[in-house]
Amino acid sequence: MSKVCEISGKRPIVANSIQRRGKAKREGGVGKKTTGISKRRQYPNLQKVRVRVAGQEITFRVAASHIPKVYELVERAKGLRLEGLSPKEIKKELLKLL
């Protein structure tokens, strides 16, 4: 499974992990010194959200910040004719509403 939000497109980003030593100036020291910088990845907080649309259960992988958007899509879909479609097709139709 990819680590990408299906609604917002949030994906892992590259950040730096900075190792420091010393005592902060505000605590009476001479200041923090950087002893090493290495790359690390920050992942979005992806959650699986299952909803029922047109009698079908559909699973979305979305960032936690976009979970309400899934339920908003389900509300908007109530006017659409989705009966007889596969879950994959229903999901495509819902994502078109964005």
UniProtKB/Swiss-Prot annotation:
GO terms for molecular function: structural constituent of ribosome. GO terms for cellular component: ribonucleoprotein complex; ribosome. Keywords: Ribonucleoprotein, Ribosomal protein. It holds the Pfam family Ribosomal_L28. InterPro entries: Bacterial_rp_bL28, Ribosomal_bL28, Ribosomal_bL28/bL31-like_sf, Ribosomal_bL28_bact-type. It comes from the Bacteria. GO terms for biological process: translation. Belongs to the bacterial ribosomal protein bL28 family. HAMAP family: Ribosomal_bL28. This is Large ribosomal subunit protein bL28. It comes from Thermus thermophilus (strain ATCC BAA-163 / DSM 7039 / HB27).
